Design a protein with these regions (language model features):
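Short beta-strand micro-motifs enriched in acidic
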Residues: 36, 45-49, 133-137, 201-205, ...
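Carbohydrate-binding surface patches
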Residues: 199-203, 208-219
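Extended interfacial segments that mediate partner engagement and assembly in macromolecular machines
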Residues: 59-71, 77-185, 205, 220
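Rossmann-like S-adenosyl-L-methionine
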Residues: 2-7, 18, 218-233, 237-453
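Short, acidic/hydrophobic/Gly-rich beta-strand patch recurrent on exposed beta strands
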Residues: 22-27, 145-148, 212-214, 342
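Terminal RNA-binding accessory module
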Residues: 1-71, 75, 358, 365
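Short, solvent-exposed loop/turn elements at beta->coil junctions and helix N-caps
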Residues: 116-123, 188-189, 196-197, 201, ...
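Short, conserved phosphate/pyrophosphate- and ester-handling motifs at nucleotide-, phospho-/glycolipid
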Residues: 39, 163, 285
Length: 453
């Protein structure tokens, strides 16, 4: 019999689901409860009953599970960004390992080794990029923060534990300067107000800092003075203004101009020199990304005469980080700015197109074209978005028949699905390594090694 809304029941949390919610069972139904830990015993209010399962929230914690720790962020619950801050990092790593194992066993139906997750070098202050929505609080003051789950209500946050302290301090100072200059925050309901988002990025190894104002309009009143003040106080390498006057939840508009500095920052990732503005995709946790890239390189097992194909290559960092191991690299990416960045990096490294060729194409279309041309890469790396690879891409990969396919994924479910498809078309799943790029959140990456035959 289904539960009823507002019904109070006592539950013991058994495990965490792959979205970070605690899972318990009662009367044959699963109940999902946010911000709980395995072993917790709690009085739970049913907030959303369904036919065969329900969602609840803790009314009273009766007994804490062994992995529960003191919550050290006052807005972690409503903010929704740090869904796992209430459990120890050891417990978090165990849960993330299980997320990936469950995906490949249950969804992929694959009997493949999944070692324990490779934990992140740092669990706090690790983000090299943040995009903060700008709004007003109940007193009319300008604030930044994060959207509450499943809403566009801003939860004000002055000290996000995941981003460097200077980003929090810069956000607070910017809000004060906006108020002092009579500049308003954007209101998406009325499509009025000026500043929509603050975008900040840091070169992790270089220390260079970028700030971009995303504005509804052409710029800011007193823009030069505000930017000069912030550049001086926070040692900013560059400041930009991005114009977004559309009624949209897409953060960045199409037009960006530089106010101060070079318009980009420089950094290195796995030894590859990079230049980044605001449009380029870049892993937000540099040290952990280097752990992931090292595992991908190990799985690739490249040889000196090999041809490496890097699909969904972004700025080319994975492929370029492996180029010393092989003879030729072709990278494919659909975002023009990323492809230009990859080409620029290759040129800075003294590589011509015969050695490192980057193409602006859809991954599936490019893979199909290469297969039709008779291309036979020895190793293919794919790093698709959360939706995974489409069947056209997988079909072309199977047709090109590389000896090794390395999949990098931010979604274990779609990675398991795609790996299963490849195992049905001539490949064997050798190993799946979870890697934690996003400590204190529900997200986990994985690297999959598949070999021909």
């Amino acid at each position: 019999m289904p539960f009823t809304k507002n019904q109070i029941i006592t539950l013991e949390i058994e495990a965490l689901s792959n979205d970070g919610n605690g899972v318990a069972h009662k009367d044959g139904q699963a109940v999902f409860v946010p911000l709980t830990a395995p072993g917790d015993v709690a009085e739970v209010r049913i907030v959303k009953p369904m036919k065969t399962y329900a969602f609840g929230r803790v009314e009273k914690l009766l007994t804490a599970g062994p992995g529960r720790v003191r919550q050290d962020c006052p807005v972690a619950g409503p903010c929704g960004g740090c869904g796992l801050r209430h459990i120890s990092y050891e417990a978090e790593c165990a849960a993330k390992t299980q997320f990936v194992r469950d995906a490949f066993a249950r969804l992929g139906k694959l009997d493949v080794p999944v070692p324990d997750v490779l934990g992140a070098p740092d669990t706090d202050r690790y983000r090299n990029k943040v995009q903060l929505p700008v709004g007003t609080d109940e007193n009319g003051h300008i604030v930044t923060g994060f959207f509450a789950g499943r809403s566009h209500r801003i939860v004000a946050c002055t000290d996000c534990k995941l981003q460097p302290a200077w980003m929090n301090e810069l956000a607070a100072r910017t809000c004060a300067l906006l108020e002092e200059n009579g500049i308003t925050a954007y209101n998406e309901e009325t499509h009025t107000g000026r500043v929509r988002h603050l975008y900040m990025r840091q070169g992790w190894h270089s220390g260079q800092r970028l700030l971009c104002f995303v504005v509804n309009g052409n710029g800011l009143p007193n823009e030069a003075e505000i930017c000069a003040t912030l550049q001086k106080e926070f040692a900013l390498t560059t400041i930009l203004v991005n114009r977004n006057s559309e009624r949209t939840n897409v953060i960045l508009g199409r037009r960006t101009r530089t106010v101060l500095g070079p318009g980009v920052i420089e950094d290195t990732l796995a030894g590859v020199p990079l230049r980044m503005g605001v449009h380029e995709f870049y892993q937000v946790n540099t040290p952990a990304a280097e752990v992931l890239y090292a595992k991908a390189r190990e799985y690739a097992g490249l040889k000196p005469d090999d041809f490496l194909l890097d699909l969904y290559c972004g700025m080319g960092t994975i492929g370029l980080s492996m180029l010393a191991d092989c003879k030729r690299l072709v990278g494919v990416e659909v975002v023009p700015q990323a492809v230009e960045g990859a080409k620029e990096t290759a040129a800075r490294l003294g590589l011509d197109a015969d050695r490192a060729d980057f193409r602006c194409q859809d991954a599936g279309a490019a893979a199909a074209q290469l297969a039709a041309e008779g291309a036979r890469p020895d190793v293919i790396i794919v790093d698709p978005p959360r939706k995974g690879c489409d069947e056209a891409t997988l079909t072309a990969i199977a047709e090109m028949a590389p000896r090794t396919v390395v999949m990098v994924s931010c979604n274990a479910a779609t990675a398991a699905r795609d790996a299963k498809w490849l195992t049905e078309h001539g490949y064997k799943a050798v190993e799946v390594q979870p890697v934690d790029l996003f400590p204190r959140t529900k997200h986990v990456e994985c690297v999959v090694k598949l070999t021909r035959g």
